[in-house]
């Protein structure tokens, strides 16, 4: 209110001094008290609101998507959906339309990025085209890890989920092996054939729209991978070494932000089942050629067995 008070005072002084016509001074004073409303820039006046995502973490399942999302949330310009939305891969959700999808996103201001993750997107044939039609400008993040390790992690999650629901269990060997050979119908095996899924995505989106994160490197040393993600998303550099610390008890890196420390859910980092060496060797051999095809499509290599 101070600027208004000073303006009225100037008007009154001018009236007394006779510098201006009294009526003009009164009008001037009224303008000072009730100045014209000048619209503010949208970045100031716009309230936070949900909108379609700017970034989608499309997979892979058990590749480190939750860790990637939590690390992205360290950045002040990132607003992330907390749950997996499954908009593009579940018909029951997709039929609700783009407005419903936007309503599942967190509120964000102009200049902030909205992010969602649904790992099942990567291996779903229908998803790429649906994303292109709904949010064609979205950037895509794909985090991958060594295929055999991903398969073992996939099995471990399903095993514990069934255990919690008191459902019958099957050993990995029962699911993975058939008559002494790999069961090529095992879903967890197919999810690790990254080249097949990536080829379909690249038939819809240019490679430049997608950034590949090395999930194994992210576990060992998060910062270098996160700096690459910041650069791809054109975020100002914020994430730094102080945001991470190694938890000796859990055996992986946890997060630190504004003095608060937090680790991923206890379900992360579960011990994998013991697997016979001959089965592991079969898996490594089976994935060798598909991995090379994936490297060629991706235009980058990974340090896998």
Language model feature labels by segment:
Residues 54-55, 60-61, 66-69, 73, ...:
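A generic "structured core" feature
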Residues 64-65, 101, 115, 131, ...:
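Generic structural signal for small/hydrophobic residues in well-ordered secondary structure
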Residues 199-285, 289-292, 303-305:
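The conserved 3'-phosphoadenosine-5'-phosphosulfate
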Residues 47-49, 175-183, 267-278:
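Short glycine/proline-rich turn/loop motifs
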Residues 95-98, 124-125, 195, 277:
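Structural motif corresponding to alpha-helix initiation and N-cap regions
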Residues 1-7, 12-122, 134-138, 147-171:
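PAPS-dependent sulfotransferase catalytic core
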Residues 126-129, 133, 137-142, 149-243:
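PAPS-dependent sulfotransferase catalytic domain
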Residues 98-105, 128, 198-199, 291:
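Generic structural signal for well-ordered alpha-helices
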């Amino acid at each position: 209110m101070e600027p208004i008070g000073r303006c009225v005072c100037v008007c009154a002084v001018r009236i007394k001094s006779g510098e201006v016509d009294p009526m003009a001074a009164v009008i001037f004073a009224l303008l000072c008290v009730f100045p014209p409303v000048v619209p503010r820039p949208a970045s100031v006046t716009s309230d936070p609101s949900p909108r379609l995502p700017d970034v989608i973490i499309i997979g892979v399942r058990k590749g480190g998507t939750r860790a990637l999302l939590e690390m992205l949330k360290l950045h002040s310009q990132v607003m992330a959906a907390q749950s997996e939305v499954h908009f593009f891969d579940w018909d029951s959700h997709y039929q609700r339309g783009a407005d419903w999808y936007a309503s599942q996103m967190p509120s964000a201001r102009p200049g902030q990025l909205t992010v969602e993750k649904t790992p099942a997107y990567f291996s779903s044939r229908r998803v790429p085209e649906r994303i292109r039609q709904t949010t064609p400008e979205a950037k895509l993040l794909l985090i991958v890890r060594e295929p055999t390790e991903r398969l073992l992690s996939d099995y471990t999650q399903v095993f514990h989920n069934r255990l919690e629901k008191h459902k019958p269990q099957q050993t990995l060997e029962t699911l993975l092996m058939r008559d002494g050979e790999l069961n090529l119908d095992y879903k967890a095996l197919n999810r690790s054939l990254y080249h097949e899924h990536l080829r379909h995505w690249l038939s819809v989106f240019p490679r430049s729209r997608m950034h590949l994160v090395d999930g194994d490197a992210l576990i060992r040393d998060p910062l270098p991978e996160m700096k690459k993600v910041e650069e791809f998303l054109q975020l100002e550099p914020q994430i730094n070494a102080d945001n991470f610390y190694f938890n000796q008890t859990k055996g992986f890196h946890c997060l630190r932000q504004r003095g608060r420390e937090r680790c991923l859910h206890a379900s992360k980092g579960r011990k994998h089942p013991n697997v016979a060496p001959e089965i592991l060797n079969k898996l490594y051999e089976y994935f060798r050629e598909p991995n090379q095809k994936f490297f060629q499509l991706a235009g980058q290599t990974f340090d896998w067995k």
